[in-house]
Amino acid sequence: MKVRASVKKMCDKCRVIRRHGRVMVICTASPRHKQRQG
């Protein structure tokens, strides 16, 4: 899980979602693309 100031989709399988008021990126194709804003 990368913690970044700005989260972006890294591939076309990435999805931007909100959990508990935080913006996150989850990816089914490659879990290395997981990010959280903070």
Swiss-Prot record:
GO molecular function, one term: structural constituent of ribosome
Entry annotated with the keyword Lyase: no
Pfam families named among the record's database cross-references: Ribosomal_L36
Keyword check for DNA-binding: no
Keywords from the named record: Ribonucleoprotein, Ribosomal protein
Entries under InterPro entries matching the protein: Ribosomal_bL36, Ribosomal_bL36_sp
One GO CC term on file: ribosome
A GO biological process held by the record: translation
Annotated family: Belongs to the bacterial ribosomal protein bL36 family.
Protein name: Large ribosomal subunit protein bL36B
Annotated organism of origin: Prochlorococcus marinus (strain MIT 9515)
Originating gene: rpmJ2
